[in-house]
Structure formats: C-alpha cells, structure tokens
Amino acid sequence: MIVRDILEQIVAGQDLSRKETETVFAAIMAGAWTPAQIGALLMGLRMKGQRVEELVGATQALRACMTRVEVSTDHLLDTCGTGGDALSTFNISTVSAVVAAAGGARVAKHGNRSMVSRSGSADVLEAAGLRMDMSPAEVADSIERIGIGFLFAPAHHGAMRYAVGPRKELAIRSLFNLMGPLSNPAGAPHQVLGVYAERWLIPMAEAARELGSRHVLVVHGHDGLDEISLSGPSDIAELKDGMISRSRIQPEDFGLSSAPLATLQIDSVAAALAAAEEVLQNRPGPRRDVVLLNAGAALYAADVVPDMAVGVVVARAVLKSGAAWDKWQALLGRTSQG
C-alpha cells in the first residue's frame, strides 16, 4: 500500500474501507510511516470526516498489537472515555469505577495521563500511590483478587509511540482519541464511554457493536462534559443485546439536584486527588452526586443491576457503608482485601 495513494484518496474526500484503514494503522504501528505522513493522515481524516468503518479498522489494528491482560470478561467493565472536553473536572470516571467495583462490577479501568485537562486517571492514581509499572499479570491479579485494576495505556499500547510526536504537534483531536476507549487491553465488554461531542454518540455505539461489546452506554453532557453531567441534561446512546437506542436523562430523574459545572472543577492533580477521596469518604455535595450518576450507569452497563436508577441506589449504599473507601484502599495496596 503506497502512502501517497492513501493520502490522495483522503484528500479527494473518499472514505477508506475497514480493511484499508486497518492496514494503514498496522503500518503506522510498525513504524513504517514517517511523522509527517502520520500527521497528514490524521489531519486528512479529520477534515474529510471520520467514519465508523475507519474507526473500526483502526481499532482492530491497535487491538492486534496491544499487550493484553488475561482475565474473565464476566461483568468486566471499563469507564474510559475519549477525554478532550478540556473542562478540568476531577476524575469522575475513575472514582465512579471504584464505586462500581464496590457495588459488584469487575473493573478493568483503562486510562492515561492528561492531555488537555488538569488531571488524567493515571495522574490522580499515581499521586495516590498506585504504581504505573505493574505487569499484565499483576494487573490481572488485582482485577481477580480485588475486583478492580488499572491498565496504564502506554504500558499496553507500545505501538502507539510512533504517533505520539505527530499527535502532540497537531494538538487537535484525531481518530486516536476515539480508538483508545475501544481498545481495553483486558477486553472489557461492558463500558460507560464518555465522548467529547454529541455527534459521536451513535458512531461510537456502532463501532463498539462491530467490535463485539455487550453493553455500552456512550454518554455526553450538554455542558460539554464527557461524562454524565450534574449541571443539566445528558444524552446516552445505549448498546444492549445488539440494539442501539437513544435517551436523555437529568439529575432530577434520580432524585439529585443539578449543580453548576464549576463545583466539579479542579486546578491541580493534588486537588483532583482530594476531591476523589472526599467523595469516596461519602462527603455530601455535587461531587458525590455526579459520581452517584456515573457509578449508577456503570453498574447498569456491567449488568450488575437492572437499570440505572437501581445502580444509583447501590452506589449510594456502598459509599455510605464505607465499602467504596475500602475498595480504594485495596486498589492502592494499603489493605489486603480480596
């Protein structure tokens, strides 16, 4: 496959097939494309408009060369989203993952350091004391023994290194932002997947279906949050039993009060860690409430509860009982829970 021909095809506004995209991204991850060529491809795809078939093909290439974590996928959940909302909230999906684990989900939390916000999942977990150099076997043991483990993206997606430079220099969202959440190294088939733009709700659900996911909630808040929002409505595209449906929810649907986005924002990793721990210690307020929403959705996506409303009830209970705090301590290796 000649690089020039692929770029000419994209410049002409012609979509790549799933197989063509898989071949292109496999070549990129093998180091066969130069940084300039990778940058041209990413910009060309963005300008043309990125299609589901292209996203699926690229993700298949990424999955083919990732370092896997071998665990049972029963009720195995991820809460990794696209990121890129640039709203600098505390780590809602990470805290929600811990609460979901305390509520009975098995969690393979996939994540990375922050690109545009104040604190990514890896940033806050590392600040809390979690090692980022855990082997796949150690991560698998954490999932099986504790019920939650963290999969640090660079440790499992080494082939992505060839695209790091072009992505940083372009400094725009690209297909890679969408591929990452669809490439859980443990193969988690259950997911709450936040997206940075409403237009990606259905395409991401369609891609997840093509890639074999079981139950996925693709979510986007009207305030731009790539989580279920507390400041107003959130849209959801749900993949379940092979079917995709759309819905809109509000905090009041679950007995919670709306609150301004500013109540969830932080300005440093230290502030993000403090926010996470105050929620896990069940301190009332908007931060706890937004976690109740997202953890409730996570428990539903994991098929631990019959609907999101019950999930919110369970999330509230594990925070109140201290089970969520205990799960956090176990994840960090401070207790021997198992």
From Swiss-Prot:
Question: Sorted alphabetically, which InterPro entries does this protein's record hold?
Answer: Anthranilate_Pribosyl_Tfrase, Glycosyl_Trfase_fam3, Glycosyl_Trfase_fam3_N_dom, Glycosyl_Trfase_fam3_N_dom_sf, Nuc_phospho_transferase
Cofactor field: Mg(2+)
User: Which E.C. number(s) belong to this protein?
Assistant: 2.4.2.18
Q: For this protein, what does the record note about how its cofactor is bound?
A: Binds 2 magnesium ions per monomer.
Which reaction equation describes what this protein catalyses?
N-(5-phospho-beta-D-ribosyl)anthranilate + diphosphate = 5-phospho-alpha-D-ribose 1-diphosphate + anthranilate
Q: EC class of this enzyme?
A: transferase
Provide the coiled-coil residue spans.
Answer: none
Listed binding positions for Mg(2+) 2 are: D226, E227
**UniProt keyword Transferase present:** yes
Per UniProt, 5-phospho-alpha-D-ribose 1-diphosphate binds at 81, 84-85, 89, 91-94, 109-117, 121
Gene Ontology process terms (BP): L-tryptophan biosynthetic process
Keyword Glycosyltransferase found: yes
- List of residues binding anthranilate 1: G81, N112
User: Which UniProt keywords are given for this protein, alphabetically ordered?
Assistant: Amino-acid biosynthesis, Aromatic amino acid biosynthesis, Glycosyltransferase, Magnesium, Metal-binding, Transferase, Tryptophan biosynthesis
> What single Pfam family name could you report for this chain, choosing any that match?
Glycos_transf_3
**Subunit note:** Homodimer.
- Alphabetized HAMAP family for the sequence: TrpD
Role? Catalyzes the transfer of the phosphoribosyl group of 5-phosphorylribose-1-pyrophosphate (PRPP) to anthranilate to yield N-(5'-phosphoribosyl)-anthranilate (PRA).
Question: Which NCBIfam families does the record associate with it?
Answer: trpD (TIGR01245)
Could you identify this protein by its name?
Answer: Anthranilate phosphoribosyltransferase
Recorded source organism is Acidithiobacillus ferrooxidans (strain ATCC 23270 / DSM 14882 / CIP 104768 / NCIMB 8455) (Ferrobacillus ferrooxidans (strain ATCC 23270))
